[in-house]
Every structure is written in structure tokens, then in C-alpha cells.
Amino acid sequence: MNIQETIQTLREELNQHNYNYYVLDNATISDYDFDIKLKELQDLENKHPEFFDEDSPTQRVGGTVTKNFKTIAHQYRMYSLDNSYSKEDLIDWENRIQRVLGNVNLQYTCELKYDGASISISYQNGKLVQALTRGDGFQGDEVTNNIKTIKSIPLKLKGDYPERFDIRGEIILPFAGFEKMNQELIEIGETPYSNPRNTASGSLKLQDSAEVAKRPLECLLYTVAGNNLPFKTQFEGLESARKWGFKVPNEAKLVNSMQEVFDFIDYWDVHRHKLPYETDGVVIKVNSIHSQEELGYTAKSPRWAIAYKFKSEQASTKLKSISYQVGRTGAITPVANLEPVQLAGTIVKRASLHNADQIEKLDIRINDTVFVEKGGEIIPKIIAVDLEKRPENSEVTQYITHCPECETELVRNAGEANHYCPNFYGCPPQIIGRIQHYISRKAMDIEGLGGETVALLFKNGLVHNYADLYELKVEDILHLERMAQKSAENLVNGVEKSKEIPFESVLFALGIRFVGETVAKKLAKHYKNIDALSQASLMDLILVDEIGERIARSVIEFFENEENKIIIERLKKYGIQFETVERVNPNATEKFIGKTFVVSGVFSQFSRDELKKAIEDNGGKVGSSISAKTDFVVAGDNMGPAKLEKATKLNIPILSEDEFITKLNESE
């Protein structure tokens, strides 16, 4: 055997041992013997660099330093899941599905919901080429070098696999590894980590991949995304992923009814604490991929999947004090400061009290013993008071009447739960919060400028609103704490680059109350520019798709405010994009203007997205459900019987794929 063959044999042996241990949980070699073989391979590779292979087991130890993580678009969007908290919720979900599919017999895949950091890993020709964090679902941070250090993730695949696909999973930190890491920190006098989930998530963003390699992270895979995949069901997809070398949890189960879903939930609600890692629920997916395609997606989540959350854990502790926070819109949020208590794997020191009504409803008082619950919330909540332990001298909590930051008298609008500080342009947290919102990734996405720096700029009198950002010069900010020449230049350059951000994002960045990302996109698309929007009447706004009276009034109030008018004029002067830039499609026409289409089924010449784009490029609108307002239904193979029946009943023309293409190619 020559040197190259020896190296290749060692690599194959070590890869197989890694797979046996980290994926199959079956050690087939002692740690000592494994290390001896790994050292032998390292020595041979060092002596013969001409045989270097980036997928060698020796490259698992990391060593690459990443100073800035690139943000890259997901090829296939990473959706969130809708949550359910009762079996009744699941029955309602199944009923909604059946109304679309036509009361067919359904199978479901039940999988445990692991509490970690979501990841999307891309493979091409059997090799790992890229790994992205979830990010906002549309784009994520590239963490490929760090992901390659996790031994349960294959660098090369086994068997017969698609040429290109993405696989999604959860990066988790098992309890044993987490406890070992914390024990090592305690021994050297360092602060231990708070919980496995945050530690796993933070590990992905460490700059030195060698540090990531030291952490006992694992990856549990749960879905494959791609075109022309070699399976027709979710469960077959999991089995295929196992054959390719991925660690797919064995707990996943294929069931034939909602009752079997309930049985799965009941079993794991009792036995989940025996698992070596955190799980907070069950994910239920329609098993048939064809049915998944038929059901489609909402703006945020797949209609064919839902998460069932296990009931929250509770703990009791003492309420030490109540503090009040001011948000960017002036909303006051009371927060309970608690004696630290262990809850669901974390140390809890604070809990949300929501508003004055909640404090009054629970009759919460300082020094009370309270019951704290942690569900899906970032901050836990108080659910009850232990009245038997209440001190005799306790006093009823009086909700504050003035802003804790600027001392302005608070207001409470009719029908709203929150109190507000009306000092919109003079209250420091509101000013800072608005600027922080303006610079955020989904808004102006200003690189080199973070929330702490915004607070520092305000504290030093350099900014009082987001228009002031465009007046900043490097020499103005060099004297700030932790601000070097390069940092100052990056900040100013980031602000300058934000002038390229499109109108819909600018509109969201302005921070108009009730105008989120989706609403901002609709308004930008409808009005085309800021001047037309600012002059719109209440009735004009309400007529825009999905814009109700509450949003419309908020938009009008924003543009009627003199301070806002001044800020917008300044932003115009600085060159901010206040007009929609129409992207010209040379093949676009107006032949479908005023027509609404519903697309259903599976197509051979178009993907569903391509078909929808063809409709929109030619002036048409794509609806999600069939109604009297639908003009055409484009029906692919295996169109749902319920949709077919409804379209027929309403006498809506049903076009085959070929008929649609003919219609598309007709001259106007």
C-alpha cells in the first residue's frame, strides 16, 4: 500500500468510527486507539501536503478564524411553525387541512421539537458546501467553518443522494456536555453558562472554529429541502437522510390518525425528561409531500405543520421589586424583579407583568411569593400569588402615574391595555428605541452601528432622531468610548450605504405604529412614493388590501406631525429612497390586469413560484383560496378535490397547465 492509499484508508476508518459513535451512538474503537490513528493521519498529511483534503477527519478540529459572518439568502426559505397548546388546537388544525384537501385519509409524522439553534446545511455532489443560521428566515449568517467541526454532521455523504439539496436541523448541546462545560468554568472561577440552548446558539457565532470544536455540540436533522427529491413523504425523507449519514432522531414516528398523534404527545410529555437533551414539544407534519404542496404556506409558516408545546414548567420565588420599562412607542411595561430561581434549565431573575390590569388581576405585591411559568416566552411570566405566604404588612401595588424616565404624566387610550408616555420626542428611551429600530437589519440594516452605540451617540448629544445619523462625521465620533478610527469609518460608511435601501424597508424603518414589515410592503407597493402615501385620506388607506382603520389612523397621525414632516424632508435631502423602483421585466404585459388566479396542484413545466410570478408579471393577482372574486383556477396534477368542487360550483374557469401557457402566450 503506497502513502496515498494509506492516508485514504485511515480517513475512511476514522470517518466510519466517527459515524458509529456520533450518529449511531455505538463506539467501535477506544478513545486511545482513535487518537493514535488520528495522530498517524495528521503526521502523514503534514509530510505529504499534496494529498490534502478539506474533508479529512483531521480538519474537524477547526482553526479557521471568521471575523465577520456573511449574510447569505436561503435558497429555500426557513419558515417558522405555528404553535398549539391543546389537543383542541390540533383538531382545529386538522379540520382546516381537511377543508383544503377534501377529507382524505392522512398520515402524520410526529417528531420531538428540540430546543436549540436552527441551521440549514447545503450539500452539492455529496459534499458539505455551506451552512447558514436561520436568521430572519429569508437570509442567515454563514457559519460553515464552525458547523464543519460538529462530528455528527457528515462532510461527505454515503449512498445514493441528490446532486444538490439543503437539510435543516437543530444544533443542540446535550445536558451532560453542558454540565461538564459549566463545571470546568466554575473550577477556574468563571461564570457558568445560563442554559444549553443559548450556549449552543452562541457557539455558532464564535469567531474561532477551534473553540467551537471543543464544545460537545450535536446536530439533529429533521427535514430535507430541494427539487426532485427521491422520496414522496416526510418520513421517507428522514429515512433517506439516515442512509446518507445524518443523525436523525429515532423518536420520530409515522402515525395514521390524530388519536395516534395524541398518544405520541402523551407518551413524550411523561418521558421527555429522560432524554439527554432539551425538548419543549412535538412537531406534527402532514406526511405526504404532495399534500404539503397543496396546502402551501401562510406569510410566516407552513399550513401542513404545527408545533404542540408541552405545558410550561413552574417555580415559586419572592417578588423583590417592580421596575417599569419604556419602549420606542412609549408603551410602559412593568417587570417583576425576583429572587433568582431555577426554572426549565435557566436561572430566572425577572418576569413580565404585562400591564396595570395584570397587576390588579393577580393582586401582586412587593415581597409576595409568586408562581413563575416559562413557556415559549423570552421573559417568564407570573401566573399566581401564594396568598398563604403574603406578609401581613403588604401594601396594594400602585401603578405609576408618570414616566420613570422623563416624568411626563402617562396616558392610557380607550380600549388599550398599556399606559403610554406621550413625550414622543423628548423621552430618552423612546428616542433611542426609534433610532435602534431604524438601523435594525430588517429596516435600514446599517452595518457598523449597534444598539449600544446608538445609546452612546444620544448620551453625547450627537443624535436626537434618525435623520441626525446622516450628519455624523468620523471626527465627531472618534472620542466616544471604544470607538477607534476603523470603527468610526465603518459606522459612517454604513450610514451612507443605507441610502440604497429600498422604499418598503425605509417605510418600515420610520417606526410608524402598527406598520410592520408586511404592511410597509403593501403600502409601498400601492402608493409608490412617500408623497402619495403622506397625502392619502383615511378612506383611501382603508381601501388598500389588509389595511384596517387602526393602521390607517396611525399612518395619518404620523404624517400630520410637524416633527415627522421635518425629519422626512431632511431624509429626502440626504438621498434616502422614498420611491419604489420598478424592476422592468422585458416579457411583462398587462394582459391579466384585474384578474385573480388561484394556483393548485403539481405542475410539470413550472414550479408553483414560477407560475405565480408569471401571473403577477402580467398584471394578475394570485389568491390563496377560491372565492367568488376568483377569475381563473390553474389546476395541476392531483388538485385537491375540495378546491375542484368549489371552483366548479362557482362556475370559475379551470385551466390546465397547457391552457394557461396558451393564455400566457396570447397577444393582448
From Swiss-Prot:
Residues involved in NAD(+) binding: 31-35, 80-81, 111, 134, 170, 285, 309
Annotated TM spans: none
Any one GO molecular function term: metal ion binding
Protein residues bound to Zn(2+): 403, 406, 421, 427
One Gene Ontology term, aspect cellular component: cytosol
EC class: ligase
Cofactor(s) of this protein: Mg(2+); Mn(2+)
Domain BRCT: 587-668
Gene3D superfamilies for the chain: 5' to 3' exonuclease, C-terminal subdomain, 6.20.10.30, BRCT domain, DNA ligase/mRNA capping enzyme, Helix hairpin bin, Nucleic acid-binding proteins
Catalytic activities: NAD(+) + (deoxyribonucleotide)n-3'-hydroxyl + 5'-phospho-(deoxyribonucleotide)m = (deoxyribonucleotide)n+m + AMP + beta-nicotinamide D-nucleotide
EC number: 6.5.1.2
One Gene Ontology biological process: DNA replication
Active-site residues per Swiss-Prot or TrEMBL entry: 113 (n6-amp-lysine intermediate)
Superkingdom assignment: Bacteria
Keywords attached to this entry: DNA damage, DNA repair, DNA replication, Ligase, Magnesium, Manganese, Metal-binding, NAD, Zinc
Listed Pfam families: BRCT, DNA_ligase_aden, DNA_ligase_OB, DNA_ligase_ZBD, HHH_2, Nlig-Ia
NCBIfam families: dnlj, PRK07956.1
Function text: DNA ligase that catalyzes the formation of phosphodiester linkages between 5'-phosphoryl and 3'-hydroxyl groups in double-stranded DNA using NAD as a coenzyme and as the energy source for the reaction. It is essential for DNA replication and repair of damaged DNA.
Protein name: DNA ligase
The organism of origin for this protein: Flavobacterium johnsoniae (strain ATCC 17061 / DSM 2064 / JCM 8514 / BCRC 14874 / CCUG 350202 / NBRC 14942 / NCIMB 11054 / UW101) (Cytophaga johnsonae)
